[in-house]
């Protein structure tokens, strides 16, 4: 995030910056960790509109991948060792 980012953007960027390859979190977990519980939709909008963040490591609360980007997200997650089946992250 650039220095002129909002406090919310900065907090989300910090959370995303701590994610390691193969680590998957939900939009809600990112929002809560950033100090904004309940702001899961705002996290989604921010990821949609921002470049350079590991968006593929963030999924819905049910493990579903980003609509319209499922193939790319599954490929990126698979390259990091994350199992995906039927458009969802598979635990284990």
Functional labels for PLM-detected ranges:
Residues 1-92:
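Nucleic acid-binding interface residues in structured DNA/RNA-binding domains
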């Amino acid at each position: 995030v650039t220095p002129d980012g909002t406090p919310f953007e900065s907090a989300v960027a910090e959370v995303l910056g701590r994610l390691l390859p193969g680590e998957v979190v939900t939009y809600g977990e990112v929002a809560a960790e950033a100090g904004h519980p309940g702001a899961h939709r705002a996290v989604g909008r921010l990821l949609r509109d921002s470049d350079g963040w590991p968006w593929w490591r963030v999924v819905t609360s049910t493990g579903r991948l980003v609509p319209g980007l499922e193939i790319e997200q599954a490929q990126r997650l698979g390259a990091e060792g994350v199992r995906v089946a039927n458009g969802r992250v598979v635990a284990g």
